[in-house]
UniProtKB/Swiss-Prot annotation:
It comes from Clostridium botulinum (strain Hall / ATCC 3502 / NCTC 13319 / Type A). One of its GO terms (cellular component) is cytoplasm. Catalyzes the base-exchange of a guanine (G) residue with the queuine precursor 7-aminomethyl-7-deazaguanine (PreQ1) at position 34 (anticodon wobble position) in tRNAs with GU(N) anticodons (tRNA-Asp, -Asn, -His and -Tyr). Catalysis occurs through a double-displacement mechanism. The nucleophile active site attacks the C1' of nucleotide 34 to detach the guanine base from the RNA, forming a covalent enzyme-RNA intermediate. The proton acceptor active site deprotonates the incoming PreQ1, allowing a nucleophilic attack on the C1' of the ribose to form the product. Belongs to the queuine tRNA-ribosyltransferase family. Residues 252-258, 276-280 are annotated as: RNA binding. It catalyses: 7-aminomethyl-7-carbaguanine + guanosine(34) in tRNA = 7-aminomethyl-7-carbaguanosine(34) in tRNA + guanine. The keyword Zinc applies. This is Queuine tRNA-ribosyltransferase. Zn(2+) binds at residues 309, 311, 314, 340. Gene3D superfamilies: Queuine tRNA-ribosyltransferase-like. HAMAP family: Q_tRNA_Tgt. Keywords: Glycosyltransferase, Metal-binding, Queuosine biosynthesis, Transferase, tRNA processing, Zinc. It is an enzyme of class 2 (transferase).
Length: 376
């Protein structure tokens, strides 16, 4: 259940109550594709840096180790030793982005595994069953992610199919939640708005799925190559047509400036691989924007990554030392930078929540964008 606590302009401060705890929103979800953050970061680390929600990937976990294995181990929470909320995506994005050979039919999608090439089928019911086996807190509906740009006629047909799939997802989840051997029989379902960059298709789809009384609503199919202006235009078009008493999730968006702009438009949930991926390559976020620690100017820099930061890396190590670790190809380098970036993101969201609580979010946003100077 979502409770709106405060608004600052269109920015929303809320609480989302789940079977695994209350999520303070706006929130950034840390992406652990295979039930782990790439960069040697553990679930204990995530708690220490203030992570509220972990996101795992249905497609990848279905292939390895297999959702049946996870179910036999008691579900994702026990499997990865994490007692806070977990969101699993439906696998739809990976089916359409990773699989070179796929066939879309009304019942679902036939595709080839990106690991060994074997033929696999996934549809709404299969996605729900896999996510039920994983026993995540929040399951995402199975949808079709169209390429961007795509012909209008195809997008219209795709959105209609995604709506039919959403009804099937809801029916199947209700069935699964009623079974005696279901680990989490209070699993929640978020629907996904699609429609490419066509505002009218997006709006009509938002109105349609808003009537389904789901636990939350996501805006999908963005951050896939369109301009930031197009992204903001679609968010502006869609958000007013989604229920105000449900959380709104902007899928796959994680550039800090994009997060600020989306919060300013009423978005509550975010996720992205960016902080971990950048950290693994020595790109770290600071109050003054993103920097590359491999640059020669940091060789003798005795400052922490970001002065004033309370993450484990900044409290104990210098830029010079971490740069040396990267040059020496030590795994500790990746770990420290991933920890720092994840802390930066979770701290950013805490500052955003405080700014909305204090009704100064607009001023906060403008100050941060000026400080970053287009570098974040």
């Amino acid at each position: 259940m979502y409770k709106l606590l405060k608004k600052s302009g269109k920015a929303r401060r809320g609480e989302f109550t789940t079977p695994h705890g209350v999520i303070q929103t706006p929130v950034f979800m840390n992406v652990g594709t295979l039930a782990a953050i790439k960069g040697a970061v553990s679930s204990m680390d995530l708690k220490e840096i203030g992570c509220q929600v972990e996101l795992s990937n249905t497609y990848h976990l279905h292939l390895r180790p297999g959702d049946e294995v996870v179910k036999k181990m008691g579900g994702l929470h026990k499997f990865m030793n994490w007692d806070r909320p977990i969101l699993t995506d439906s696998g739809g994005f990976q089916v359409f982005s990773l699989s070179k050979i796929r066939k879309i039919q009304e019942e679902g999608v036939y595709f080839n595994s990106h690991i060994d090439g074997r033929k696999i089928f996934m549809g709404p019911e299969e996605s729900m069953r896999i996510q039920s086996n994983l026993a995540s807190t929040i399951a995402m509906a199975f949808d079709e992610c169209v390429e961007n740009p795509a012909p209008r006629e195809y997008v219209e047909k795709s959105v209609e199919r995604t709506t039919r799939w959403l009804h099937r997802c809801k029916d199947e989840m209700n069935r699964l939640n009623s079974l005696p051997d279901t680990i989490n029989n209070k699993q929640m379902l978020f629907g996904i708005n699609q429609g490419g960059t066509y505002e009218d298709i997006r709006i009509e789809h938002a109105k349609t799925i808003a009537k389904m009384d789901l636990d939350g609503y996501a805006i999908g199919g963005l951050a896939v190559g369109e301009s930031h202006e197009d992204m903001y235009r679609i968010i502006d078009a869609v958000v007013p047509h989604l229920p105000e008493d449900k959380p709104i999730y902007l899928m796959g968006v994680g550039i800090p400036s994009n997060i600020l702009e989306a919060v300013d438009r009423g978005v509550d949930f975010f996720d992205c691989v960016l902080p971990a991926r950048n950290g693994r390559h020595a790109h770290v976020f600071t109050k003054e924007g993103k920097i590359n620690l491999l640059n020669a100017k940091f060789e003798l820099d005795d400052r922490p990554i970001d002065e004033g930061c309370q993450c484990p890396a900044c409290k104990h190590y210098t830029r010079s030392y971490i740069r040396h670790l990267f040059k020496a190809k030590e795994m500790l380098a990746m770990r420290l930078c991933v920890l720092h970036n994840l802390y930066f993101y979770n701290n950013l969201m805490e500052e955003i929540r405080d700014a909305i609580d204090g009704n100064y979010f607009k001023e906060y946003k403008e100050r941060k964008l000026k400080e970053w100077g287009g570098r974040a």
